[in-house]
C-alpha cells in the first residue's frame, strides 16, 4: 500500500483488460471480484493478485467397505454420522477385536480453526454456525471472534458427547498427526475428517491393507435445505507488480497467460 501511494508501480488495468486471456478472466471472476479488489486502488489495478482456490466444505472420509458390510447408507447429517460411528465401534466390521475399533480418528493437532487441515472439525462446528479462531462479521457488520461466540457451546457439547460415547479416538489428546494417520493406515479407524486431498494424504498406505480398503467422502452437517456452513480464507496472499516506467507492462499479463495455458493443458 505504501509503495502504491508513493507511485512506485504502474497501473495494469489496461493491460489486463486488453491482454488477459478468457481463462485468466474466468479464474478471477470465480472469486466474485475479491481477488482483483485486493489489488485495486482508486479504481486502478496496481498488481496481479494470486488466486488461491478455496477448499470448500470439509468432508468426512468413511470406510465404504465397512458401510457396505453393515448395510448402512452414507450419512448426510450429524445424527447420521453419529449412528454410523456407533455401528463401526460396536459391530467392529474391520475385525479389530472388541474395543479396538476407532470410530472417528482424531489428534490434538489442528482440531479446529486450521483451514482445510487434516483432522479439522470445522465442518462439524460450522453446522452450528461456529467458526473457531476466525474473525467474522455478524449480520449488522460487527466484527467478532469465533472462538468466543455463543454458538461454540453447542458445537463443543456435541463433540464432548461423542467423546464420552467412545465414538472419537479415546487417545486423541496424546496422538500427533502421524500417530493418528497410523490408525487409518493400520485399519483401526473407520472415519476421519479432511478435504478433497484424502486419496493422496493420508490414505495411500491404507490401500495396502490385507483385503484392501475402500474409502468414500461425504458432506455431512447439512442444513435442512441440503446446504452447509463453511468459511473461506482470503484468496490473495501474493502479488506481482510492475515498476513505474517499465516500457511493456503488458508482458506481466502475457506471462501469466502462458503459465495458465501450460497448467491447463498439462497432460502429465
Feature locations, PLM:
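Extracytoplasmic/secretory soluble proteins
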Residues: 1-268
Amino acid at each position: 500500500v505504501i509503495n502504491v501511494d508513493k507511485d512506485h508501480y504502474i497501473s495494469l488495468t489496461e493491460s489486463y483488460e486488453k491482454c488477459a486471456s478468457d481463462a485468466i478472466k474466468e479464474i478471477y471472476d470465480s472469486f466474485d471480484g475479491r481477488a482483483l479488489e485486493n489489488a485495486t486502488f482508486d479504481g486502478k489495478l496496481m498488481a496481479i493478485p494470486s488466486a488461491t482456490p478455496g477448499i470448500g466444505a470439509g468432508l468426512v472420509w468413511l470406510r465404504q467397505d465397512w458401510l457396505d458390510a453393515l448395510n448402512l447408507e452414507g450419512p448426510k447429517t450429524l445424527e447420521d454420522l453419529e449412528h454410523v460411528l456407533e455401528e463401526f465401534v460396536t459391530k467392529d466390521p474391520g475385525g479389530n477385536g472388541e474395543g479396538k475399533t476407532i470410530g472417528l480418528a482424531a489428534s490434538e493437532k489442528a482440531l479446529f480453526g486450521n483451514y482445510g487441515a487434516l483432522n479439522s472439525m470445522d465442518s462439524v462446528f460450522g453446522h452450528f454456525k461456529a467458526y473457531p479462531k476466525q474473525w467474522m462479521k455478524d449480520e449488522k457488520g460487527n466484527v467478532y471472534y469465533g472462538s468466543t461466540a455463543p454458538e461454540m457451546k453447542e458445537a463443543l457439547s456435541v463433540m464432548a458427547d461423542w467423546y464420552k460415547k467412545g465414538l472419537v479416538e479415546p487417545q486423541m489428546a496424546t496422538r500427533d498427526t502421524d500417530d493418528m494417520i497410523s490408525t487409518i493406515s493400520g485399519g483401526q479407524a473407520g472415519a476421519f475428517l479432511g478435504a478433497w486431498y484424502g486419496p493422496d494424504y493420508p490414505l495411500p498406505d491404507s490401500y495396502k491393507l490385507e483385503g484392501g480398503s475402500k474409502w468414500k467422502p461425504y458432506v455431512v452437517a447439512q442444513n435442512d435445505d441440503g446446504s452447509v456452513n463453511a468459511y473461506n480464507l482470503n484468496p490473495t496472499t501474493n502479488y506481482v507488480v510492475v515498476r513505474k516506467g517499465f516500457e511493456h507492462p503488458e508482458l506481466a499479463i502475457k506471462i501469466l497467460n502462458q503459465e495458465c495455458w501450460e497448467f491447463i493443458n498439462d497432460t502429465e
